[in-house]
Amino acid sequence: MTRNEKSEVIAKLESEFKDAQAIVVCDYHGLSVKKLEALRNAAREQNVKVQVIKNTLANIALKNSAKDGMSLKDTNIYLWSEDQLAVTKVVVKFEEANSEFFKIKTAYIDGEVASVDKVKALSKMPSRDELIAMLLQVWNAPIQNFTIGLNALKEKKEQSA
């Protein structure tokens, strides 16, 4: 890779990392190409970007986008997105299915380096759409119970008449 190509890669990664709300770094040593493609497909469905990047290039891009502090060693695959929950859900689900070859190493979430435990905890949270559905269900419950009660009262009066 020439110096110009490296500069282009760093500039591209910088701009993408600046927009990313979450960046997760994982070890994928020993993962088959088929499994790696499955990860890429699952990530693509959630608008999560996946890329294997040299650590030196990733370090420069992270530092230039004000997201440094992660210690990067060995072979790494990077996943990032503007949606924190999407990244964590994809990564944790894939790690559970492929724990022998795929491990979460570190992450950058909410402006700070995050532990593996924080990534796993975040993945268990409901998404925005799920939270809205829960809220609507809570708001709808009293009205629904009221109408059920009125219908029961109506049927009782009809039977007694």
From Swiss-Prot:
GO molecular-function terms, A-Z: large ribosomal subunit rRNA binding; structural constituent of ribosome
SUPFAM superfamilies per UniProt: Ribosomal protein L10-like
Keyword Transcription regulation: no
Domain of life: Bacteria
Family in the record: Belongs to the universal ribosomal protein uL10 family.
Functional description taken from the UniProt entry: Forms part of the ribosomal stalk, playing a central role in the interaction of the ribosome with GTP-bound translation factors.
Protein name: Large ribosomal subunit protein uL10
